[in-house]
Amino acid sequence: MAELATIARPYAEALFRVAEGGDISAWSTLVQELAQVAQLPEVLSVASSPKVSRAQVAELLLATLKSPLASGAQAKNFVQMLVDNHRIALLPEIAVQFEALKNAREGAADVQIVSAFPLEGAQLAELVTSLERKFKRKLKPAVEVDSSLIGGVRVTVGDEVLDTSVRARLAGMQAALTA
């Protein structure tokens, strides 16, 4: 996967520089849509077919988008460049890296919160507020429920993990007892 990230990085950075001249959120939506479309097996098979021209593949990708930016020259050029260089499969990684650049500019980060029980609005808001103080940046939460944690939460921000789950504590106790 590191290789895909390395290849996708220049595309994400170039697109981000273009987006800085306009609405970064709109460009983020566009690249997310492109990433979703590019993952469809039907699109990948059409894109790899020798019977379909590169211009037709680019038109197909742009036609599936809902974003108003899709009709702009910059979006068309970006998609055409990806098609010409056989980089459509990179779109999901380009979207991930574009989002990381957007978050870095906003001083924000995505946070994955896994809880043993569903978190209600007030609980989630309080947890996010305390995590923002701890990590010293604005956080965008994505919440999952995993009953195997037994209790507590596991929080992932970038490459940092904060695991306060009962399952993690039990695993720590087991390791201490068997050592």
Curated annotation (Swiss-Prot):
Cystine residue pairs: none
Principal place of residence: membrane
Keyword Amino-acid biosynthesis: no
Function: F(1)F(0) ATP synthase produces ATP from ADP in the presence of a proton or sodium gradient. F-type ATPases consist of two structural domains, F(1) containing the extramembraneous catalytic core and F(0) containing the membrane proton channel, linked together by a central stalk and a peripheral stalk. During catalysis, ATP synthesis in the catalytic domain of F(1) is coupled via a rotary mechanism of the central stalk subunits to proton translocation.
GO terms of molecular function: proton-transporting ATP synthase activity, rotational mechanism
Pfam families for this protein: OSCP
Signal peptide: none
Keyword terms, alphabetized: ATP synthesis, Cell inner membrane, Cell membrane, CF(1), Hydrogen ion transport, Ion transport, Membrane, Transport
Membrane topology: Peripheral membrane protein
Subunit structure, interactors included: F-type ATPases have 2 components, F(1) - the catalytic core - and F(0) - the membrane proton channel. F(1) has five subunits: alpha(3), beta(3), gamma(1), delta(1), epsilon(1). F(0) has three main subunits: a(1), b(2) and c(10-14). The alpha and beta chains form an alternating ring which encloses part of the gamma chain. F(1) is attached to F(0) by a central stalk formed by the gamma and epsilon chains, while a peripheral stalk is formed by the delta and b chains.
NCBIfam families named in the record: ATP_synt_delta (TIGR01145), PRK05758.2-2 (NF004402)
Lineage: Bacteria, Pseudomonadati, Pseudomonadota, Betaproteobacteria, Burkholderiales
Compartment annotation: Cell inner membrane
Name listed for the protein in its UniProt record: ATP synthase subunit delta
Gene3D superfamilies registered for this protein in UniProt: N-terminal domain of the delta subunit of the F1F0-ATP synthase (1.10.520.20)
GO cellular component entries: plasma membrane; proton-transporting ATP synthase complex
Domain of life: Bacteria
Family statement: Belongs to the ATPase delta chain family.
InterPro entries recorded: ATP_synth_OSCP/delta_N_sf, ATPase_OSCP/dsu
